[in-house]
Amino acid sequence: MVKRGCCHRKMVNHKGCLVSGIFLAVIGAVLFILAFALLPHLINQTTQNAVIQAVIVDSTSSQRYNDWAGQQSIENYYQQYFYAWNLTNPNEFLNGSIPIFETVGPFNYKYEFNFSNVTFQDGGNLATYTQSKSFIYQSDMSPNDPNEIMITNINPAYLGLMFQLAPNAELLDNMPAENLLIALSGCGQMRLFLEYLSSDNFTNIVYFTQNPKLYQEQYLNILKSLNGDEQYFYQQWANATSIPQKGNGWYGMLVSSVNNNNESSNISILSAKLLFNSSNENSILNQEIGSTLWINALLGDKTSITVLTSELQLTVDQIDMILNWWLNDFSKVYTESYVNEICDIPDISMLGVCQFVTGNALNGRSISNYTFLTQPFDQGPIEIPLLYQSIGIDVKLSVSVQQAYKSLFNESDSNSILNLNGLVNFLTASKSFDTFKQYNVTLFDAIKIIGYATAELYEQYNKPTILGLYEKYGGLIVTRSMDDWLWNCQDGILDYLGVDQPCALQQNNTVNKPSTIFTGQQDLSMTNQIFEFQEQTFLTCWNGSVQVEGFTESGQFPPLQSDPPQTMTLFEENVIRPVQLELSGDSQVQGIDTKRYYLVNNSFPISTTFKTTIPGFANLTDIQNLPIYVSLWDMYEVPPQYSSNNLQGLNQTYQSAQVPLDLEPITGNALYYNLKLQINLAIPEFSNWFSSNSTFKNMKSNVFYPILKIGQTATPSQSNIDLLNSQFKLIKILGFVPVIVVSIIGGIILIAGISMFAFGFKKLRQQKQQGYQAIINNE
C-alpha cells in the first residue's frame, strides 16, 4: 500500500482498500539498529575527545560519516526475523469453532540501510537525512523456505475493504458491508466485460456478424459487372492470385490472393457455392448455425472443423485459408470501416465500448446470445441497454461512444469507473447532480449506469464472481506463501476491483520521508535524540498533538555516561510514540561490560491520547485505515478476554515477550537488543459486515487475531568483538599509558610496551585513567 505519514487521513471509499503492506508499511520496516560504527576504528587518542570525535557526526567530513550513513549495515549483521501465525483449522473456524494457531519460523533477513540527501543545520547540531531500507533473505540462516511454506490467516486486504466500506454500508439501511462490496464490484465486472469486448476474439465475432451482409452487397456488384456469370465469379474467388481481368470490385474478394505462397486454394466451385449459400447451415453466411460452426473452428474446435471439412468438401488448410481471408482481408477492406461508422468511432479500438453502451456492433444482439465454445457470459446480457431490455426497460444512453470511452471506460484513466475508486467517485457525484457534468453524461445516463453496475449486475454477475474469487483466492481467510505474506502478495479481489496496491505486510527497498536528529555537537546528552520524524515535530494523528521525542532506534545513545540513567526514552517508529526503557542491572556482551535495560511493563496502556482502549494493544487503526493492533509477542500484557480466551496457541510469558537492550556506557553503543513486536488484526466491535447467508457469517466481532511476529536484532563481527574486548582490557589496565602506540606499532614494540608496563605497574595503577578508545557505533 502507499505509505503515508502518521497524520495523513484519507476518505474511506476513495482509496479502496487499502490493504496489507499497504496496510502495514511502518510496522517492521524500522529496525532497532546496533551502533557498530566504532568497531572498525583503532583507538587513536586516549582522551574523551577521541570518543566524542568517533561518536559525533556533524558534517560529511566527520570521522565516522560513512559508517553512520549506512556502510556499517553492510559490514555487520543486522537481522530482522519473522514468525508467522498459521491458522490450523480454517474450515472449523469458519463454522464457528475457536481458532487454533501455531507459529512457523523463523524466516531471517539481513537488513541494510542508507542515508541520502544528508544536510547539517545549526552549525552541525542537527542532521537531516532520507533513509532507504532493504531486506535480503538469508537462506543459510533460515530453517524454512518462505517460497515453499504456506500460511493461512486473516486477509488484511479483505479486512481493509470491509472496514472501509462499513460506514457507508450503514448509511444504506444498515446494509452488510459485504453486500456493498458485491454491489461495488460491478466496477470489476464491467472491466471484465470490456476486456473481452475489446479482444480480438470479440472483433472476429463482430466480423462474422457483419460480413455476410457486406459480402452479399459486394458479390452482387461484382456479379452485375460480370453480367451474371456466377461460374466465373466462384472460379476467380477460389483460385485467382491477382485481380481478374473481367469484372469490377475484386479487391478484398479473392481467397487465394492472401496466400503468401501465391498459390491457388484449389477450392472447388461446388464447395464455394455451398460455402456462400446462406440457407446451408454450414455456410459462413448462415447466421443461425453456420457462423457458430465457423467461430468454433476458428477457436480450434476439432468437431466443428470435422463437420465443415465433411459437409463443404474442404481440407483443413482450405478452411484456414478461408478464415484468414474472411477475417484479415475482406473484413479490413469492407467491414472495419462500416463498423466504425455505425459505432461512430475513429477506429476499431473503441469497438468494445460501442457494443457495451449501444449494442450496435452486433446489430442489437448481445454477445451472451452466441453459443460458441468458451462463451464467458451465460448469465444474460452484459451490454447496458440490452440488459435493461431483458427486464422490460427501454434504455438508450445519450452519451456518445467516444465520450463514454473518454470519461467512463478508459481503463488507463484513474477516474475510470472500471476501478473501485473511480466508481465510488462517480457515486459520490450523485450527491450533486451538476457534478455529473465533469463526466459529460446526463443525469439520466448516470443513474442508469449506476443502477446497471451496482444493482442489475448484482445477482447474475457480481455475486457469482465474488464467490468465485472467494473459492479461488480466499476472502477473509487466505492461504499464501510466506514470501507472499511478507513481500510479494497480490490479492485476487483487489485485482478484480482494479485497486492497484500491494497487500504484503512488509515493503522492501523503501524510502522514508526526511527525519532530523540532534547530533550531540552542542550537548552530548542530546546525541541521536529525534527532533523531527518524517517532517513532523508534532504528531497530529493522535488525540491532541504529541511531541516527537526520545532517542532514535539506531542503537546510539549519549557517550561518556559515568552514571547511566535509570530510564531512557526511545521514539518507537513502529507504533509512532515514545516508549520507556528501564535499567535492570549489569550485563555483559561477549566479555564487554554493559548495562541491561528492558522495555517497561505496561508499555501500551489505556490512553485517550493514543486511542488505546485495551491495555497491551497499540491501536493503529486510524493511521493505517485498517483495524490493526501492535502488541508484544503472543499478545503479552493483553487481558485474556481479548486474547487467550478467544484463540489457542499463545505463549503469554515474560521470557517470550521481554525486550532487552545492553548499553555500553562509555561509547553509548547498544551492543545487543531484541525488539519483539506482533501484528494483530481484528473485526471491530458491533460490526455489521456479513449477512446471515454469507460464507463468513460466523465471524465474531471484537476478536483479535495474531498475524505476524517481528523480531529485530543485530550481531557485530567476531573480529570486531575481539578488538573491542582487547582494547577495553588495555584501557582498564594501562590508564594513562598511550595505548594508541601499542595498537599501531608492530609486534616488537608491543612486547616492549608490555615490558614497560610490568616494570612500572605499581606506579601506574595510582594514576587516574583518562582516555577511552573508540569502539563500535551504529546509527
From Swiss-Prot:
GO MF terms, alphabetically ordered: phosphatidylinositol-4,5-bisphosphate binding; scavenger receptor activity
Signal peptide as annotated in the record: none
Any single GO BP term: phagosome acidification
Sequence intervals crossing the membrane: 18-38, 733-753
Chief localization: membrane
Lumenal compartment spans: 39-732
Membrane topology annotation: Multi-pass membrane protein
Protein name (database record): Lysosome membrane protein 2-A
Taxonomic classification: Eukaryota, Amoebozoa, Evosea, Eumycetozoa, Dictyostelia
Gene: lmpA
